[in-house]
């Protein structure tokens, strides 16, 4: 039992706000293992687009080390090689146009169009996550722009968000 206000505050922060350091280590290890599995998807599924292995991004409060209890969400972006895809920004959306030369992305387009369907792309992530044997009992689904993975063995969810690494066009 704390004897001073400062000691009571420190105890409160340690026990109720800050993440437990051992759980944090376990979460980072679990996140890193997940990323390793995702990086292997193109080798196991010929329909899965190429990944920029060096371009995955840890983001969100857990990555920024500003997450407070409970540890319930870990966010990761996985960068895909654009393979000639281009994008246009509108006020309400971004459209990715897929060239005929990109067979893997063509399969993920809207019917009879060359516009990438983000739901199909995320569902491809979901399908491949379900094929990881350690995740066979996990709750895996598409949630907006992420493939969400809820493990039975941990209290946190993983949100895996696909993104693209493109090169500049002549206009910047």
Enumerate the predicted regions with their spans.
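Catalytic cores of NTP-dependent nucleotidyl/adenyl transfer enzymes across multiple folds
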Residues: 1, 30-35, 109-172
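N-terminal regions immediately upstream of nucleotidyltransferase
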Residues: 1-71, 82-110
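Acidic Asp/Glu-based divalent-cation binding sites
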Residues: 75
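Short loop/turn segments at strand-loop or loop-helix junctions that form parts
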Residues: 78-83, 161-163
């Amino acid at each position: 039992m704390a004897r001073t206000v400062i000691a009571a505050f420190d105890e409160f922060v340690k026990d109720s706000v800050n993440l437990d350091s051992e759980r944090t280590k376990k979460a980072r290890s679990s996140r890193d293992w997940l990323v390793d599995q995702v990086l292997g998807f193109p080798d196991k599924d010929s329909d899965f687009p190429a990944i920029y292995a060096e371009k995955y991004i840890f983001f969100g409060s857990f990555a920024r080390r500003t997450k407070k209890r409970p540890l319930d969400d870990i966010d990761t972006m996985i960068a895909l090689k654009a393979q000639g895809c281009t994008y246009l920004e509108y006020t309400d959306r971004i459209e990715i146009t897929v060239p005929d030369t990109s067979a893997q992305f063509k399969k993920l387009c809207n019917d009879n169009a060359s516009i990438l369907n983000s739901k199909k792309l995320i569902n491809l992530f979901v399908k491949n996550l379900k094929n990881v044997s350690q995740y066979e009992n996990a709750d895996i689904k598409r949630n907006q722009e992420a493939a969400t993975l809820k493990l039975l063995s941990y209290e946190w969810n993983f949100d895996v968000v696909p993104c693209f690494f493109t090169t500049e066009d002549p206009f910047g």
